[in-house]
Amino acid sequence: MANSKSALKRIRTSERNRLRNKSYKSAVRTLMKKYLQAVEEYAASPTPENKAVVDQRMSAAYSKIDKAVKRSVLHRNNGARKKARLAKALQQVASAS
């Protein structure tokens, strides 16, 4: 256990930041899963409604990833890699149909 006041404060601060970062990462993962699920549905039946859902979910996922990068929860290369994977998933579906 920490002995000094400053070390105790660092423990509290790092725990607070860890929980905040955890919630951001969880939200990013959730939105990515929802987007990939929408892409699968669009691949199964490419209707304009499904395309609109895909576009909406992509926008939400990109936004959350960018905010996580801005707040240094994710490294910018990690954020770029996640966005590239999302774009690639849609590109593969579009080229297949």
Swiss-Prot record:
The keyword Translocase does not apply. Pfam families: Ribosomal_S20p (PF01649). GO terms for cellular component: cytosol; small ribosomal subunit. Belongs to the bacterial ribosomal protein bS20 family. This is Small ribosomal subunit protein bS20. One of its GO terms (biological process) is translation. Keywords: Ribonucleoprotein, Ribosomal protein, RNA-binding, rRNA-binding. One of its GO terms (molecular function) is small ribosomal subunit rRNA binding. The keyword Ribonucleoprotein applies. The lineage of its organism: Bacteria, Bacillati, Cyanobacteriota, Cyanophyceae, Oscillatoriophycideae. Binds directly to 16S ribosomal RNA. It comes from Crocosphaera subtropica (strain ATCC 51142 / BH68) (Cyanothece sp. (strain ATCC 51142)). NCBIfam families: S20 (TIGR00029). InterPro entries: Ribosomal_bS20, Ribosomal_bS20_sf. Residues 1-22 are annotated as: Disordered. Transmembrane segments: none annotated.
